[in-house]
Amino acid sequence: MAPKIKYTREEMIETGINIIKESGIENLTARSLAKRLSISTQPIFTCFGSMEEFQAEIYEYVEILFHEKTQAGLKANTPFLGYGKAYIQFAREEPELYRLLFIDNKKQGYLKVMKDAQDLIRPSLQKIYHIDAKSADFYYSNMWLVVHGIASLIVTECCPYTDKQIGEIMMGFSLSICQSIKTIPGFVDNNYDGYTLYKKMIGE
């Protein structure tokens, strides 16, 4: 007869996430989870089969949490700037969870997180900025580099910028990319003469 399980899967996942928040994914083991719950490791493997399965469910839960937090930023007047600020705020408030999603993930699950976020944001970008889907995806991928770079600096405690400066940096990049999409033919397809445009811009 199988032993009675004292904790539900959800409670084990919640406890696992708390361990990650406190000391990182590298310290989430069957033994550390069992110790926190004051149980043996057997109920954990009864519920999940393996730590790989357990960690996969934790990753999925954290991804959902990330999307919930960042999607709220789309309610701002400028959707991607609101999203970007929420993205950075998530990194600031939950650095270990951010590491789990985007830095320490060896299976490149962050690519799925990026794609899911892109799918969520695309309609808002098209509606607010009056651009087609391809241009919206181009805008997103370029702005993601900026936002992810800032968030990574914050998580690694290397960010030299104030919140005001971060907002100004994001606005500057956003305006530049959006303007280029709208005014430079072939920009989205990388089918334009950048060298000639630069010479014209600097007055040569």
Where would I find each of the regions flagged by the language model?
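Amphipathic alpha-helical packing segments from all-alpha helical-bundle domains
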Residues: 105-130, 137-145, 168-179
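Short linear capping/connector segments at secondary-structure termini
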Residues: 100-108, 159, 192-194
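Alpha-helical structural segments
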Residues: 11-18, 53-75, 82, 86-89, ...
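C-terminal peripheral helix-coil segments that are non-catalytic and often amphipathic
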Residues: 123, 127, 156, 160-204
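Helical hydrophobic small-molecule/effector-binding pocket
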Residues: 80-103, 109-114, 144-147, 151
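Short, Lys/Arg-enriched anionic-surface-contact patches
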Residues: 1-8
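Helix-turn-helix
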Residues: 11, 15, 19-53
